[in-house]
A protein has these predicted regions:
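Hydrophobic transmembrane alpha-helices of secondary-active transporters
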Residues: 53, 57-86, 236-239, 261-282, ...
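Structural signature of hydrophobic alpha-helical transmembrane segments
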Residues: 61-73, 122-136, 159, 177-190, ...
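Transmembrane alpha-helix boundary signature
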Residues: 30-42, 55-61, 75-92, 107-128
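Predominantly late transmembrane helices and immediately cytosolic-facing juxtamembrane segments
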Residues: 2-12, 29-32, 45, 171, ...
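Structural signal for the N-terminal portions of transmembrane helices
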Residues: 213-214, 285-292, 352-374
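Entry/N-cap segments of selected transmembrane alpha helices
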Residues: 83-111, 181-193, 279-305, 328-335, ...
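Transmembrane alpha-helices that form the ion-translocation and gating core
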Residues: 98-139, 294-352, 370-382
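Interfacial helix-loop-helix linkers and transmembrane-helix boundary segments
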Residues: 62, 82-97, 122-124, 150-152, ...
Length: 398
């Protein structure tokens, strides 16, 4: 019985977040233990791969960031395409408020970071780091501490998190793609074009899209373009309505197949190679630098201010509305949960900042995310208790 309960928990969003947290804590413990040398030798070890005229040699950390994380971006793209075209956020009225809040939730942390980093000792390059929201942690926490709050809150948070993912992908593509190799890019585009043609067939071959994705990502690694952009483009090529020979929707089949690997392999492994910070190897003053404060305050203050402020403003202007049945207190709790950055914040940290600043800033991401998680969970748990005391109804909705 205990074993079946554990397995059931691990299949939920809180379970996925729990596994990723364990991976990050394990990395932090190893990096500050006698086994630190083995840990850093592992993540820095080079892995050469060559196919025909293309050859690339990257560290394990880089392969996880540029290779495995492409699977995460593919999964996010598939989810976005389905939810917008056929799912819970296909209605324009439902899209308005969370999309506006998602945009403001990226602007808010960026502004806080830039304000903190103006002047001596600041580094303006890290403004993208506190902008994303970690969907697994945020949705998992909502489901764990407040499962009986209005379902519209979850839909709002899901839409906002997906919009954040798209915004992060756009930032990565625009800001962090350098030194383009046109031959590899042209070949990647050619493979993508073939995938689009196959998508028009009545019964597209399932394996062709898998092979196409692998080829596009491999070529993109050689091209200088971020693999996140390539993975997202591959997701857009997968048809929503076309079915494989067994009658199953290709897009839904890929979603179901990828989800456990993303939740329990890709994201935990990314957390493991990213969160290993040797605390003793960095001067104490670095832990209180402007970039560190900018990221921590961006997540804990900028995110909720941007999200909550935009929902309030859009409701006042009648261009959007808060989730149906939810109170402003519950909206505040969700806005606080949006300050959990984690996976994509780690990803952007590795792209935006020099190596000597990354350990301190990654620790700031962990601290800011933990504080946001605790604050949001406390507010939502309190609201859940209040509703339960009133028999599920909130007759004094604020």
């Amino acid at each position: 019985m205990a074993r079946s309960s554990t397995l059931a928990f691990l299949k939920t969003e809180p379970g996925a977040g729990f596994v990723m947290t364990l991976a990050a804590l394990a990395a932090l413990a190893l990096a500050n233990s006698p086994a630190a040398g083995l840990y850093f030798d592992f993540i820095d070890g080079r892995v050469p791969v060559g196919v025909g005229p293309f050859f690339v040699s990257l560290s394990v950390e880089a392969w996880v960031r540029d290779g495995l994380m492409a699977v995460f971006f593919l999964s996010a793209g598939l989810e976005l395409k389905y939810e917008v075209l056929r799912g819970e956020i296909s209605s324009p009225r439902r899209l308005a408020a969370p999309l506006l809040a998602g945009a403001a939730g990226m602007v808010g942390p960026a502004v806080i970071y830039l304000l903190v980093n103006l002047g001596p000792g600041g580094d303006l390059r890290g403004w993208t780091v506190p902008t994303p929201t970690d969907a697994a942690f945020a949705l998992g926490s909502l489901a764990l501490v407040a499962p009986r709050l209005p379902r519209a809150l979850r839909l709002f948070l899901l839409t906002l998190a997906v919009a954040d993912d798209v915004g992060a992908i756009a930032l990565i593509g625009v800001l962090y793609s350098h030194g383009i190799h046109w031959r590899a890019l042209a070949l990647a585009l050619a493979v993508l074009a073939v995938m689009l043609l196959l998508a028009r067939r009545r019964r597209p071959p399932r394996l062709a899209f898998i092979a196409g994705f692998v080829l596009v990502v491999a070529l993109t690694i050689n091209s200088g373009i971020s693999t996140s952009v390539a993975a997202f483009a591959c997701a857009m090529a997968v048809p929503v309505d076309r079915r494989s020979r067994d009658g199953e929707s290709l897009l839904r089949a890929y979603q179901a197949a990828l989800q456990p690997y993303v939740a329990y392999l890709v994201l935990p492994l990314f957390a493991f190679v990213s969160a290993g910070i040797a605390l003793s190897a960095h001067p104490p003053g670095g832990w209180f630098s402007r970039p560190v404060w900018g990221v921590a305050l961006g997540l804990t203050l900028g995110k909720p201010l941007g999200v909550f402020g935009m929902v309030f403003l859009s409701s006042a202007l009648k261009i959007g509305r808060k989730p149906m049945g939810a109170t402003w207190s519950e909206m505040l709790g969700v806005a606080l949960l949006c300050g959990v950055g984690f996976d994509l914040s780690f990803f952007l940290c590795g792209l935006a900042l020099p190596a000597d600043q990354q350990p301190q800033v990654r620790l700031a991401v962990m601290a800011g995310s933990a504080l946001s998680l605790a604050a949001g969970s406390a507010v939502l748990a309190r609201r859940q208790w209040v509703r339960d005391q009133r028999g599920g109804a909130d007759v004094f909705a604020d």
